[in-house]
């Protein structure tokens, strides 16, 4: 359903979340069935969402990714959904469990009609969960839903154990603390190397970009040199409970060293020559306003 937005124009999603997507294999009958809108943008809310909501069955958004949204914006979105009898759905697959033992909408204080969870909810095991208001969820009983895994217990068991442990250890608070440390490492390493840096994301879901001539090459070099130190890293970091102080310290030393190398190579126009393979592919990008 998401890709169907690009049936009308291949550029429909370029300023949304995932630019560079081809709607291959998507039935043409879904053309005009999805209308993208800009997240946390009040102008677009007035111009498009309010006008088109009456034609829609649901409004689906991620409540947060790169940064926390305006609470006022989410409240207005909820108001529009209610006025037009739309179901407001929050995709919490990425944002949940990062800052507290629940979806991030609980921290923001705006509650959707339906929320979707996955991945982290079972700490990596295959598990998903959909929660919502009774009058909406009951409609699922009128549809055909089948599965070969009705009696599978691993996913639910892992999810219950994860949620219990998450709450017991206050993991959200820990992830925020670790994420702040990582962001600070990037900032200080860039300052030390004389590089300009852009850091984005909420603390547990952070990313960085060194503002050099060719960041695609720079990011590839960073990954390459980190691998040599037996560190699997990229230009983003999803904070983890098992990121111990000693591991973070090892990562810090590596960042200082590699950022300095990038600065030197960039200065001497030798960064691309220092790659031991092709630069990372960036055709399938992820951008969030």
Predicted stretch roles:
Residues 58-73, 86-108, 114:
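Conserved PLP phosphate-binding loop immediately N-terminal to the Schiff-base lysine helix
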Residues 162-187:
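Structural signature of PLP-dependent enzymes
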Residues 179-183, 187-223, 273-288:
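Conserved PLP-binding catalytic core of the aspartate aminotransferase-like
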């Amino acid at each position: 359903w998401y890709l169907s937005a690009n049936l009308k124009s291949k550029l429909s999603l370029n300023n949304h979340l995932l630019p560079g997507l081809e709607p291959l294999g998507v039935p043409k009958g879904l053309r005009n069935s999805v209308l993208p809108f800009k997240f946390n943008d009040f102008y677009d809310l007035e111009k498009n969402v309010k006008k088109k909501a009456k034609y829609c069955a649901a409004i689906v958004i991620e409540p947060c990714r790169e940064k926390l949204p305006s609470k006022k914006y989410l409240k207005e979105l909820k108001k529009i959904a209610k006025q037009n009898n739309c179901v407001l759905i929050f995709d919490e697959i990425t944002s949940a469990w990062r800052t507290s033992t629940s979806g991030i909408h609980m921290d923001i204080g705006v509650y959707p009609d339906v929320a979707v969870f996955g991945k982290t909810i079972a700490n990596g095991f295959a598990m998903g969960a959909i929660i919502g208001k009774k009058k909406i969820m009951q409609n699922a009983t009128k549809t055909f839903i089948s599965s070969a895994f009705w009696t599978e217990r691993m996913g639910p068991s892992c999810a219950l154990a994860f949620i219990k442990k998450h709450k017991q250890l206050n993991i959200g608070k820990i992830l925020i603390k670790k994420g702040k440390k990582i962001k600070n490492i990037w900032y200080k390493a860039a300052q030390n190397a004389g590089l300009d840096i852009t850091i984005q994301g909420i603390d547990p879901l952070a990313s960085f970009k060194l503002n050099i001539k060719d960041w695609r090459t720079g990011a590839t070099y960073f990954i390459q040199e980190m691998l040599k130190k037996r560190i699997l890293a990229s230009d983003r970091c999803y904070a983890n409970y098992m990121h111990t102080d000693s591991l973070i310290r090892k990562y810090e030393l590596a960042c200082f060293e590699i950022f300095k190398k990038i600065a030197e190579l960039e200065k001497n126009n030798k960064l691309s020559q220092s790659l031991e393979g092709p630069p990372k592919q960036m055709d399938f990008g992820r951008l969030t306003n």
